[in-house]
Amino acid sequence: MNNSLENTISFEEYIRVKARSVPQHRMKEFLDSLASKGPEALQEFQQTATTTMVYQQGGNCIYTDSTEVAGSLLELACPVTTSVQPQTQQEQQIQVQQPQQVQVQVQVQQSPQQVSAQQLSPQFTVHQPAEQPIQVQVQIQGQAPQSAAPSIQTPSLQSPSPSQLQAAQIQVQHVQAAQQIQAAEIPEEHIPHQQIQAQLVAGQSLAGGQQIQIQTVGALSPPPSQQGSPREGERRVGTASVLQPVKKRKVDMPITVSYAISGQPVATVLAIPQGQQQSYVSLRPDLLTVDSAHLYSATGTITSPTGETWTIPVYSAQPRGDPQQQSITHIAIPQEAYNAVHVSGSPKALAAVKLEDDKEKMVGTTSVVKNSHEEVVQTLANSLFPAQFMNGNIHIPVAVQAVAGTYQNTAQTVHIWDPQQQPQQQTAQEQTPPPQQQQQQLQVTCSAQTVQVAEVEPQSQPQPSPELLLPNSLKPEEGLEVWKNWAQTKNAELEKDAQNRLAPIGRRQLLRFQEDLISSAVAELNYGLCLMTREARNGEGEPYDPDVLYYIFLCIQKYLFENGRVDDIFSDLYYVRFTEWLHEVLKDVQPRVTPLGYVLPSHVTEEMLWECKQLGAHSPSTLLTTLMFFNTKYFLLKTVDQHMKLAFSKVLRQTKKSPSNPKDKSTSIRYLKALGIHQTGQKVTDDMYAEQTENPENPLRCPIKLYDFYLFKCPQSVKGRNDTFYLTPEPVVAPNSPIWYSVQPISREQMGQMLTRILVIREIQEAIAVANATTMH
């Protein structure tokens, strides 16, 4: 055999060549595999090709690649597959200590309902067993000492003589049919379909044995008027650009439906979602952060077929001096649970129910008032209506519209019940009950009757005004539509001005803005965005609110990314003029408060910034913005001066072992709050620190992982400095570049622009509001 050896190399040389192509973060794994498997390991380690694009911006080169994140942060991306096993049956008994004994029994069964797979993230797998019907039956029985039924006279009762209170029975039935939701070109999945059936039985000593029974059967599906909406279908779509299921937007909407008639006490009926009792702990107010797996289970949150996820604010373990906030638990109830009811009856019936428990304390308020004519009680059927704090409670406005009787076709105004504004005057003819009767939590004043409550057709529901609709995610087509409308209006103005003026000699072609964002040049897009900050108008011809305008620009940014443009309009050097103009619009933004005292939440949410790559490690500027966002949210640094005082030496990294399992460790970074106000030699305690904890469920959004990655990309000489924390990004970098930042801190002007955009985010405003409320108490 005459085999030529000219083009052959030794095995050791081949290993050296192969090792050069192995990524640095997999080198240890390569060497270990080579020692154990031998030559077979060479086939396993192939360098994956990534498309890296570098485009020119003046004297700077900006990178982009298809890896979605940069450098060593890729190894943090671990796809998660979670199996959701539905509970077939549950029986819970809760003993509530009150003046009367109360027993609650819950039975749960489940049956599937077809919804769009858009509600689930791409790598989220659902395992569903056989079809099982779900029923929740709650029965509360209470006994109280019997006494003679007193005679009560009120001016509201139109009777010739005082009426004796008799046994009354109220039956409420609320049925909604299961609905199917389908989205175009998306495979369907089966998720549990819930039907809730509740029965409430309580006794009262006022009327010698009265009984109230309330039974509701509701299917968690939207009304037909909302199924056909394409925007609602788009709202349920989660982003597919990350390796893990993306958290959906959590709307902090504990629902308490209530309205009252002047001079009367308030009736209260509270629906408790299944599987939530274990999640409520009477602790410090905080927004519950639920990982992606919990978004689709029955614990912690409720995800309705419309795509909205209801989040429960819980409390953390510091005791509080304010007894009112210790006794309040806000419960999220799906939209269909308070949709619309049809009330008929003659006399007024009023009831109040209060349930208390050692671990969870609830106060719910819902009033049921029956006049001499039929009424339609319709809530603003919008699951995105901003529910806010008012005197420790959260309320939803209720619109009362008369459809029969003396007030036919007359719409009444919206009433928001406030416990402190409740009328104090009582009827002179009403007799004062004995002290033992005043202690009862259930009070009923009515004559023998039966009241039927049925669902009203969805067509009769009042349509919420557009300003009440708060989006859950970015809609790129909305940003494109606003740009097109503005471009058409601006081009018409330019043409009109050109006709009224004489064209100068040698004049170039008339400037026209292209309606297609993708084909717009960088300079043209920058100039157009600058003008939009001042000239953009909504459908009514009015200027956009600052937070809505910021939301539109985020939609435009997402549209550019989704269509192949790598421009970052918030950080690229070519868009400096636009960021300056946007800063002028946003710098004086304060949370909007309605005349009734409600704080309207911002249109911009944290999830939206993750969607359009304004948070994360996609570039040096984005990583710097992410660190400032976390420092504002958790360290509560609200001003530029506070951020300027932050330094590497003042941020401490701490690792704790779990008391139950020493092998489990949790890492956090801490910052001494109000640094400088503590006296010299004063002992520093844990409550003096603000803390950021790790997020093991999603490492790509973990504050600790991103802080470590920031330190990894900073020069070694600045990591111990005590005068700076935010460094200037280098103009030309690559994803695998070891240094992303210079040793110079960012300017005060640049920091102010970044912080202004951060303070508009809804979660930041909520965190600051909770901190202010805590300091006031």
UniProtKB/Swiss-Prot annotation:
Residues 6-48 form the CARD domain. Expressed highly in prefrontal cortex, craniofacial area and near the limbs of mouse embryos. Expressed in heart, skeletal muscle, liver, kidney, lung, brain, spleen, intestine and growth plate in mice. InterPro entries: DUF3504, ZnF_MYMT-QRICH1. GO terms for biological process: endoplasmic reticulum unfolded protein response; integrated stress response signaling; intrinsic apoptotic signaling pathway in response to endoplasmic reticulum stress; kidney development; PERK-mediated unfolded protein response; positive regulation of apoptotic process; positive regulation of DNA-templated transcription; response to endoplasmic reticulum stress. Residues 140-164, 219-240, 420-440 are annotated as: Disordered. Its main location: nucleus. One of its GO terms (molecular function) is DNA binding. The CARD domain may be involved in the regulation of caspase activity in the context of programmed cell death. GO terms for cellular component: cytoplasm; nucleus; plasma membrane. Transcriptional regulator that acts as a mediator of the integrated stress response (ISR) through transcriptional control of protein homeostasis under conditions of ER stress. Controls the outcome of the unfolded protein response (UPR), an ER-stress response pathway that either promotes recovery of ER homeostasis and cell survival, or triggers the terminal UPR which elicits programmed cell death when ER stress is prolonged and unresolved. The keyword Cell division does not apply. The modification N-acetylmethionine is found at residue 1. It holds the Pfam family DUF3504. Keywords: Acetylation, Cell membrane, Cytoplasm, Isopeptide bond, Membrane, Nucleus, Phosphoprotein, Transcription, Transcription regulation, Ubl conjugation, Unfolded protein response. It is found in: Nucleus; Cytoplasm; Cell membrane. The modification Phosphoserine is found at residues 346, 465. This is Transcriptional regulator QRICH1. There is a cross-link at residues 354, 359 (Glycyl lysine isopeptide (Lys-Gly) (interchain with G-Cter in SUMO2)).
